[in-house]
Amino acid sequence: MSSRTTLGLSAPDLSGLDGSGLKVAVVAAQWHGTVMTGLLDGALRGLVDSGVHDPAVIRVPGSFELPVACASLADHFDALVALGVIIRGGTPHFDYVCDAATRGITDVAVRTKTPIGFGILTCDDEAQALDRAGLEGSHEDKGYEAAQAAIATLTALSTALASGPS
């Protein structure tokens, strides 16, 4: 792992994954550009560290649009990584977008049986988001973690399904 890749407190160590030969797409929102740059860079590092070559990158306007993009792509990729940033403001909008994005991503993953690494930050302020973005000085790299989670889930499911019922 690079020196900028810092796992969150109690995060599993998923190093050593073999994602070679997998077709993976990263679906990334555009709101909060600095944070998104860190998340996207971290996700791409996480995929490369897992042996995934040439992941596709699809940009959508915001986190609300992530579920429909993932739903459209799920049948064409082995795994997806969804990245976004939602920062609390003074209205209920934060709650609505967080709920819609989370439920939407969950629904797509369950319905299509496609692992989706969940890299949507839901933060009270920009400082919290920057601290999790995998940037220089950040304490965590949630983009990296989301990418590794997608590959680890796909690997676990593939292994379980290959071994058949016991």
Curated annotation (Swiss-Prot):
<feature type="binding site">
    <location>
        <position position="132"/>
    </location>
    <ligand>
        <name>(2S)-2-hydroxy-3-oxobutyl phosphate</name>
    </ligand>
</feature>
<keyword id="KW-0686">Riboflavin biosynthesis</keyword>
<feature type="binding site">
    <location>
        <begin position="63"/>
        <end position="65"/>
    </location>
    <ligand>
        <name>5-amino-6-(D-ribitylamino)uracil</name>
    </ligand>
</feature>
<comment type="function">
    <text>Catalyzes the formation of 6,7-dimethyl-8-ribityllumazine by condensation of 5-amino-6-(D-ribitylamino)uracil with 3,4-dihydroxy-2-butanone 4-phosphate. This is the penultimate step in the biosynthesis of riboflavin.</text>
</comment>
<protein>
    <recommendedName>
        <fullName>6,7-dimethyl-8-ribityllumazine synthase</fullName>
        <ecNumber>2.5.1.78</ecNumber>
    </recommendedName>
</protein>
<comment type="similarity">
    <text>Belongs to the DMRL synthase family.</text>
</comment>
<dbReference type="GO" id="GO:0005829">
    <property type="term" value="C:cytosol"/>
</dbReference>
<dbReference type="GO" id="GO:0009349">
    <property type="term" value="C:riboflavin synthase complex"/>
</dbReference>
<feature type="binding site">
    <location>
        <position position="31"/>
    </location>
    <ligand>
        <name>5-amino-6-(D-ribitylamino)uracil</name>
    </ligand>
</feature>
<keyword id="KW-0808">Transferase</keyword>
<dbReference type="InterPro" id="IPR002180">
    <property type="entry name" value="LS/RS"/>
</dbReference>
<comment type="pathway">
    <text>Cofactor biosynthesis; riboflavin biosynthesis; riboflavin from 2-hydroxy-3-oxobutyl phosphate and 5-amino-6-(D-ribitylamino)uracil: step 1/2.</text>
</comment>
<dbReference type="GO" id="GO:0000906">
    <property type="term" value="F:6,7-dimethyl-8-ribityllumazine synthase activity"/>
</dbReference>
<feature type="binding site">
    <location>
        <position position="118"/>
    </location>
    <ligand>
        <name>5-amino-6-(D-ribitylamino)uracil</name>
    </ligand>
</feature>
<feature type="binding site">
    <location>
        <begin position="85"/>
        <end position="87"/>
    </location>
    <ligand>
        <name>5-amino-6-(D-ribitylamino)uracil</name>
    </ligand>
</feature>
<dbReference type="Pfam" id="PF00885">
    <property type="entry name" value="DMRL_synthase"/>
</dbReference>
<dbReference type="GO" id="GO:0009231">
    <property type="term" value="P:riboflavin biosynthetic process"/>
</dbReference>
<feature type="binding site">
    <location>
        <begin position="90"/>
        <end position="91"/>
    </location>
    <ligand>
        <name>(2S)-2-hydroxy-3-oxobutyl phosphate</name>
    </ligand>
</feature>
<feature type="active site" description="Proton donor">
    <location>
        <position position="93"/>
    </location>
</feature>
<dbReference type="InterPro" id="IPR036467">
    <property type="entry name" value="LS/RS_sf"/>
</dbReference>
<dbReference type="InterPro" id="IPR034964">
    <property type="entry name" value="LS"/>
</dbReference>
